């Protein structure tokens, strides 16, 4: 077993070796290095063929038409293109959007920008299980609502929203529905032929593909129109200009092909690893699981260890790569906005650690990690006066701390 142990698969995943090999074949002079937009020679034709094959592979995983897949630089760009693209194109119909308080920053910062441009946005508060229900969305819908944007799987707590039910509601009201699917590909079945989803964002690097490449599903029936945010040579039917990165696109295609083939077996294995880890830590006192216990992916365990400061615990677990909150925002010392939205107090939000498991996690690593967590939590609590007071039966929430 090699240290440190990687338990941060929701931040990024290593590229599967099978994917890396396919990518290498598209880089050098011996390989498929041409520009897919070069129509006048075989180098361009071969590159275009590889790109279209990858488009089919991505579409196959989510049961879409390949013509509905638009290449982007990642899920952040896909979210921007979907939300801004719809808002700007349909602004004459209405200027109201709906999203939730627990979305990824790539959605929340995009809607904040639209607010500065004069759009109105309703931010739905989830239940304490972290889920967004159709009833919550129905209560927020207005006559001038043009778009609802709700994530499929939450990046911090791993909860799965019922996008099928939400889609039925939005379609019946004639409102477009965008789903951030960055964390769900390869973890949850996605069937866009039956889901009433108009736009869906995908990322390669959360699914054992390379960073810097993603895709946006744009429905053809019913047809969704977008205003482009990237202008240039008119690539991707004018929706996203820029020379296509053949090697990254081929990598994403291969990663999604593997995900389709191996997802069922992989989910069973990862559920067993997650259960194995939890069984070894669940007897720790004052341990809380963040998010729904049932509607969640097995890959994610977000735990709060009360009376232990999350950052101290991360430092104590120096052989484990884990995170507090999302990788994109964990540099700030603010408590996780996702956990605050669930109604967790500052102390519990600050004591949370996200453990995420993946394709290359082993039982040996899981056992070692669980043992280290138990040791570190127990040791840090012996150093905490608050823990002593709690053990003595003092209700810490009732204490009035005097300022000096």
Curated annotation (Swiss-Prot):
Record InterPro entries: Aminotrans_V_dom, Aminotrans_V_PyrdxlP_BS, Cys_deSase_IscS, Cysteine_dSase, PyrdxlP-dep_Trfase, PyrdxlP-dep_Trfase_major, PyrdxlP-dep_Trfase_small
GO CC annotation: L-cysteine desulfurase complex
Major subcellular location class: cytoplasm
Gene Ontology MF annotations: 2 iron, 2 sulfur cluster binding; cysteine desulfurase activity; metal ion binding; pyridoxal phosphate binding
Residue numbers carrying N6-(pyridoxal phosphate)lysine: 206
The reaction(s) this protein catalyses: (sulfur carrier)-H + L-cysteine = (sulfur carrier)-SH + L-alanine
Cellular localization per UniProt: Cytoplasm
Location of the active site: 328
Cofactor: pyridoxal 5'-phosphate
EC number(s) per entry: 2.8.1.7
Binding site for pyridoxal 5'-phosphate: 75-76, 155, 183, 203-205, 243
The protein's annotated pathway: Cofactor biosynthesis; iron-sulfur cluster biosynthesis
Binding site for [2Fe-2S] cluster: 328
The keyword Transmembrane appears for this protein: no
GO BP: [2Fe-2S] cluster assembly
Superkingdom of source: Bacteria
UniProt keywords, alphabetically: 2Fe-2S, Cytoplasm, Iron, Iron-sulfur, Metal-binding, Pyridoxal phosphate, Transferase
Subunit structure: Homodimer. Forms a heterotetramer with IscU, interacts with other sulfur acceptors.
Purpose of the protein: Master enzyme that delivers sulfur to a number of partners involved in Fe-S cluster assembly, tRNA modification or cofactor biosynthesis. Catalyzes the removal of elemental sulfur atoms from cysteine to produce alanine. Functions as a sulfur delivery protein for Fe-S cluster synthesis onto IscU, an Fe-S scaffold assembly protein, as well as other S acceptor proteins.
Family statement: Belongs to the class-V pyridoxal-phosphate-dependent aminotransferase family. NifS/IscS subfamily.
Protein name: Cysteine desulfurase IscS
Organism encoding this protein: Pseudomonas savastanoi pv. phaseolicola (strain 1448A / Race 6)
């Amino acid at each position: 077993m090699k240290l440190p142990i990687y338990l941060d698969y929701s931040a990024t995943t290593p590229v599967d070796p099978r994917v890396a090999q396919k990518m290498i074949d598209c880089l050098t002079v011996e390989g498929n290095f041409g520009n897919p937009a070069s129509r006048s020679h075989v180098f361009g034709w071969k590159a275009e063929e590889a790109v279209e094959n990858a488009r089919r592979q991505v579409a196959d995983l989510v049961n879409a038409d390949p013509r509905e897949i638009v290449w982007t630089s990642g899920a952040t760009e896909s979210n921007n293109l979907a939300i801004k693209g719809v808002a700007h194109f349909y602004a004459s119909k209405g200027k109201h959007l709906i999203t939730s308080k627990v979305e990824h920053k790539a959605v929340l910062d995009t809607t904040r920008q639209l607010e500065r441009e004069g759009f109105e946005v309703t931010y739905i508060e989830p239940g304490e299980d972290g889920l967004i229900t159709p009833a919550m969305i129905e209560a927020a819908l207005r006559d001038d609502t043009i778009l609802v944007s709700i994530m499929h799987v939450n990046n911090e707590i791993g909860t799965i929203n019922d996008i099928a039910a939400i889609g039925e509601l939005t379609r019946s009201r004639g409102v477009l529905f965008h789903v951030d699917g960055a964390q769900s590909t390869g973890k949850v079945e996605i069937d866009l032929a039956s889901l009433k989803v108009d736009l869906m964002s995908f990322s390669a690097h959360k699914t054992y593909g390379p960073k810097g490449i993603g895709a946006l599903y744009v429905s053809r029936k019913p047809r969704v129109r977008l205003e482009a945010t990237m202008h240039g040579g008119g690539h991707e039917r004018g929706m996203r200009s820029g020379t296509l990165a053949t090697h990254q696109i081929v990598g994403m295609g291969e990663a999604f092909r593997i995900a389709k083939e191996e997802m069922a077996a992989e989910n069973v294995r990862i559920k067993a690893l997650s259960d194995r880890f939890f069984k070894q830590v669940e007897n720790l006192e004052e341990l809380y699981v963040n998010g729904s216990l049932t509607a969640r992916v097995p890959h994610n365990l977000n735990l709060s260890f009360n009376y232990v400061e999350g950052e101290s615990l991360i430092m104590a677990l120096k052989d484990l790569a884990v995170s507090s909150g999302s990788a994109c925002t964990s540099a700030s010392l603010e408590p996780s906005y996702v956990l605050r939205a669930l109604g967790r107090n500052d102390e519990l939000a600050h004591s949370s650690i996200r453990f995420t498991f993946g394709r290359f996690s082993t039982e040996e690593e899981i056992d070692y990690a669980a043992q280290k967590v138990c040791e570190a939590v127990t040791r840090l609590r012996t150093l905490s006066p608050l823990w002593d007071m709690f053990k003595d039966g003092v209700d810490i929430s009732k204490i009035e701390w005097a300022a000096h």
